[in-house]
């Protein structure tokens, strides 16, 4: 696996912020209502930007959210099957989207893409991309 460095992480972060803005712009192209954006900070580390559209012409509600959070320890549930992650700090960043259309014949859409990095002082970071996409009947 290729090693990851601070420049790579910043490049992914900027890409994800652009992705959030591009998705919001695309939704606004078809729905006349405005997104309300709210920046937030996480006490344990990191933060993000929540983007919400409500009561639009096409969509009942859309959320397009960016987060970049960090922490000192991974929970046991995350390390039980991956012992190489035990004792590592972490950083996770991503974009998640949920679209609830007004049309009952159009499915609800959920998607997310994320970068996860587990850091150790004594060895290179362990990192991977994850995500998913699903459509649920209204």
Residue ranges and their predicted role:
Residues 130-132:
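Long amphipathic alpha-helical segments with strong coiled-coil/leucine-zipper propensity
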Residues 50-128:
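Internal mixed beta-strand/loop scaffold within catalytic domains of large alpha/beta enzymes
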Residues 4-83:
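Gly/Pro-rich turn-and-neighbor structural signature
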């Amino acid at each position: 696996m290729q090693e990851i460095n601070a420049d790579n992480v910043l490049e992914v972060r900027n890409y994800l912020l652009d992705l959030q803005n591009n998705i919001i712009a695309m939704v606004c192209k078809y729905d006349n209502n405005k997104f309300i954006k709210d920046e937030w900070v996480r006490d344990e580390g990191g933060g993000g930007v929540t983007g919400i559209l409500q009561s639009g012409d096409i969509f009942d509600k859309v959320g397009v959210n960016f987060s970049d959070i960090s922490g000192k320890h991974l929970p046991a549930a995350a390390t039980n099957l991956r012992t190489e992650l035990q004792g590592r700090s972490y950083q996770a960043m991503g974009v998640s989207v949920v679209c609830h259309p007004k049309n009952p014949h159009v499915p609800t859409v959920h998607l997310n893409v994320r970068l996860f990095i587990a850091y150790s002082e004594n060895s290179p970071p362990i990192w991977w991309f994850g995500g998913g996409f699903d459509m649920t009947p209204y």
